[in-house]
Amino acid sequence: MDFNLLTDSEARSPALSLSDSGTPQHDPGCKGQDNSDTEKSHQNHTDESNPEDGSLKKKQRRQRTHFTSQQLQELEATFQRNRYPDMSTREEIAVWTNLTEARVRVWFKNRRAKWRKRERNQQAELCKNGFGAQFNGLMQPYDDMYSGYSYNNWATKSLASSPLSAKSFPFFNSMNVSPLSSQPMFSPPSSIPSMNMASSMVPSAVAGVPGSGLNNLGNLNNLNSPTLNSAAVSAAACPYATTAGPYMYRDTCNSSLASLRLKAKQHANFAYPAVQNPVSNLSPCQYAVDRPV
């Protein structure tokens, strides 16, 4: 005979019983307890999986809105007119395009972001390509422009040894003037051709006036006097050359007064020939005889 031996755990469990053949069998009264245990374990498993299902639902992206060509044309036209439409405008656009106001608001938000990004890229390209080459061609390095200056020893140097004295300036070199010299830039001309021409023409003009030779000679002497020459030269000289007095136009006014007085004297010294009456060959008696009574 074969005997089936039970283990210690099977012998201790109340749910097991020996059949006639000696094989262990489950007690039918304990099936409800086993079913409840399985249900509880299944519920616990579902409860643990519920948070994961919620997180998966949250991670799911919403369905993208597909716009038609007519809707995009209407939205683009409105965006060109107004980039920040208010609530009423968005509602009107939603009615025209058969969309919701929320979809229209989101579209305008994304369109503004795209527009700002494109503007920034265009400005960066202009600064990099357009203006960069022009500024590099126009601007010179500081070393080339200020090679003669020594900024480190600026405070220790005196005015005599200033770098300006050694620096060459095209404007001053063309005029043969040092930039730090104290001499005046403009000097009065030593000889003026126009005044010499005028003085040479005056005697011929005076000689053409009828009068005595002595008066003409006197007038010529007056014209050649040093007062006239000095007045004429001072009148024609540049006003910047008068450095003697503080007033610039004093000599010009005095010369004009002197010239007027000289002209008046010349006019008074001119001698006009006296007009002589025609000599008559008739005597007073003849006048009396010829008159009718």
From Swiss-Prot:
Keywords: Activator, Developmental protein, DNA-binding, Homeobox, Nucleus, Transcription, Transcription regulation. Pfam families: Homeodomain (PF00046), OAR (PF03826). Its main location: nucleus. GO terms for molecular function: DNA-binding transcription factor activity, RNA polymerase II-specific; RNA polymerase II cis-regulatory region sequence-specific DNA binding. A motif (OAR) lies at residues 255-268. Transmembrane segments: none annotated. InterPro entries: HD, Homeobox_CS, Homeobox_Pitx/unc30, Homeodomain-like_sf, OAR_dom. One of its GO terms (biological process) is camera-type eye development. In the adult, high levels detected in the eye and much lower levels in internal organs such as liver, gastrointestinal system, heart, genitourinary system and pancreas. It is found in: Nucleus. One of its GO terms (cellular component) is nucleus. Residues 1-69 are annotated as: Disordered. A motif (Nuclear localization signal) lies at residues 260-264. SMART domains: HOX. Residues 60-119 bind DNA. Residues 37-48 have a biased composition (Basic and acidic residues). Transcriptional regulator which may play a role in the differentiation and maintenance of meso-diencephalic dopaminergic (mdDA) neurons. Required for lens and retinal development and for pituitary pre-placode formation and cell specification. Belongs to the paired homeobox family. Bicoid subfamily. This is Pituitary homeobox 3.
